[in-house]
Amino acid sequence: MKKLQEAHLRKPVTPDLLMTPSDQGDVDLDVDFAADRGNWTGKLDFLLSCIGYCVGLGNVWRFPYRAYTNGGGAFLVPYFLMLAICGIPLFFLELSLGQFSSLGPLAVWKISPLFKGAGAAMLLIVGLVAIYYNMIIAYVLFYLFASLTSNLPWEHCGNWWNTERCLEHRGPKDGNGALPLNLSSTVSPSEEYWSRYVLHIQGSQGIGRPGEIRWNLCLCLLLAWVIVFLCILKGVKSSGKVVYFTATFPYLILLMLLVRGVTLPGAWKGIQFYLTPQFHHLLSSKVWIEAALQIFYSLGVGFGGLLTFASYNTFHQNIYRDTFIVTLGNAITSILAGFAIFSVLGYMSQELGVPVDQVAKAGPGLAFVIYPQAMTMLPLSPFWSFLFFFMLLTLGLDSQFAFLETIVTAVTDEFPYYLRPKKAVFSGLICVAMYLMGLILTTDGGMYWLVLLDDYSASFGLMVVVITTCLAVTRVYGIQRFCRDIHMMLGFKPGLYFRACWLFLSPATLLALLVYSIVKYQPSEYGSYRFPAWAELLGILMGLLSCLMIPAGMLVAVLREEGSLWERLQQASRPAIDWGPSLEENRTGMYVATLAGSQSPKPLMVHMRKYGGITSFENTAIEVDREIAEEEEESMM
């Protein structure tokens, strides 16, 4: 038996050993797949890239607002519970898939080709998000350049873009010591700068007539794409070095903003508003749903970024440890960002003489209107404004690197012989194509299109993708087999906590989110603008398209097989004959592609019923693996 074990470990994994003679010629395998694919130059590259990917703009402009509107400090209870039930397990699952296979979001579905449509849906979603996400980075660049002046351009009224409604709110009273007659009808200089100068939204007649291209935004968008391209030019080799700055420097700026914020008069008022617990909110299902949504989107599960980054790891990288570092670090960063934001909002509310809830907003309104207005009230306002927008720039770029690397990796893994030698050129073509598709976002009505993309591109479709991935891995491939793969990779099997979450808790939570998003569906809007019916239909179709790619992929997989429908489904759900670790030295145990006493090699099949799946196939290799394990135990006694 020892000779048999040595033969298994010594035997090279070649295409001849992975298929029957009848199969040869039908399958083209890249045996040295990982040799020329590349890896991170260091373990810290991967960790910082994951932190940069997860810690993004949403941590600054979404989490604080969600927290204070859903019970303040009490919101942290469902937030951390959902992190444990949904966030950490799904994060670890996606990292495990990528690292074990060294494959991108498309090729990883060798694990079960029937579900390859889920990988295609990931690419569609991440592609749409990347188009509008870089437009947000372009807005940040615009404000960053505007901060390089002695006086911020949104500090005063009297500019050509201002209207008679513009009012410089310097306190609860006007210059004559009397309250304005109709404070609600006035507009701050920062709001008019954003809507009338940056967006020039008054030049649009709606989403159907977006107006002319704003060339200043067009150039900022071009610069954003040039920066992204240069940083991903050499794949993870280059982006992995850039994140040493872009993933760490935001924390320095956040710390500076936090220290400055808490020293302002009225800061404690804002912090109290942010964190004062209101436990009666926990009785509302909406609060729990909001917590789950925040976890789901902030960790970036389902976009393929985590899977892609992990695919460049060495086979034994400790992603279990990395999972907890990144997920808990992301949560702590969100909480700290809330302190930095609400301390300044508290100061702002005291200066204006209005309640905190009248100055608190979420999303672009916070980043491009409220916070810039607060900056004008500080000494050295251009300096603090520059720091704030530089922080947003680095936060946004990290996520954008992941989006583009996901697309490039997925396609090059599908066509390695054609695209991998020209990966830089292919990356450039992707950036050019997305820049051209994003030009509509630089028009007068571009914000309408951005809102539509933001509302629908990664909504219910993303939840369906993650549910499908979770069920395909745990129910079809098999939870026991998946845990065995992780044991081969990390040296231990996931415990009951992870198994229970993967099998029941995480899919159930995601299903609840999906049902909630459908039941509570509300049409898109931007300010007072209501989107026309055709735009709503377009958005819904956008979300449905990613969902439909899953059954479409199933249909293609089934049509490629032979036999009855049930036989086709069985065959399509089997792992591909070359599924497993990409490097020969890591293909041990059940992945050693020879069978004891066999004259001719056979494909490596998976005993799915024994390992938790729904199909059953012969696999003598598992019996050999069991015998080897038993002999090892006897030798240790």
Curated annotation (Swiss-Prot):
Q: Which UniProt keywords apply?
A: Amino-acid transport, Cell membrane, Glycoprotein, Membrane, Neurotransmitter transport, Phosphoprotein, Symport, Synapse, Transmembrane, Transmembrane helix, Transport
Going by the entry's taxonomy, the superkingdom of the source organism is recorded as: Eukaryota
Residues annotated as glycosylated: N182
Q: State if Glycosyltransferase is listed as a keyword.
A: no
| Residues annotated with Phosphotyrosine modification | Y591
Q: Which residues lie on this side of the membrane: Cytoplasmic?
A: 1-45, 557-637
Task: Locate the Phosphothreonine modifications and list their residues.
Answer: T20, T588
Localization, UniProt: Synaptic cell membrane
Q: Key word Transmembrane present in the record?
A: yes
User: According to the UniProt topology, which residue ranges lie Extracellular?
Assistant: 138-214
User: What functional role does this protein have?
Assistant: Brain specific sodium (and chloride)-dependent proline transporter. Terminates the action of proline by its high affinity sodium-dependent reuptake into presynaptic terminals.
Q: What is this protein called?
A: Sodium-dependent proline transporter
